[in-house]
């Protein structure tokens, strides 16, 4: 059986609110850490979210 190409990751807010999104990425094409600007409802702003592992 083949290994799955997509893995689940957690995007954690850099505003230190503890808010996170769970998304998936293709681990074969995106080998570096993912970061996106998304909305953090706790601070009510768009902030940078960085990839961390799901524990």
Swiss-Prot record:
Tell me its family.
Belongs to the bacterial ribosomal protein bL33 family.
InterPro entries (alphabetical): Ribosomal_bL33, Ribosomal_bL33_CS, Ribosomal_bL33_sf, Ribosomal_zn-bd
Species per Swiss-Prot/TrEMBL record? Bartonella bacilliformis (strain ATCC 35685 / KC583 / Herrer 020/F12,63)
Q: Name one GO cellular component term.
A: cytosolic large ribosomal subunit
Example of a GO MF term: structural constituent of ribosome
Q: Where are the transmembrane segments?
A: none
Which keywords does the record carry?
A: Ribonucleoprotein, Ribosomal protein
Superkingdom assignment: Bacteria
PROSITE patterns from the UniProt entry? RIBOSOMAL_L33
Q: Which Pfam families match?
A: Ribosomal_L33
Which GO biological process annotations does it have?
Answer: translation
User: What is the protein's given name?
Assistant: Large ribosomal subunit protein bL33
């Amino acid at each position: 059986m083949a290994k799955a190409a997509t893995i689940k990751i957690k995007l954690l807010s850099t505003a230190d609110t503890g808010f996170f999104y769970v998304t998936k990425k293709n681990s074969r094409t995106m080998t570096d850490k993912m970061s996106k600007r998304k909305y953090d409802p706790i601070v009510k702003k768009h902030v940078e979210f960085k990839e961390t592992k799901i524990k």
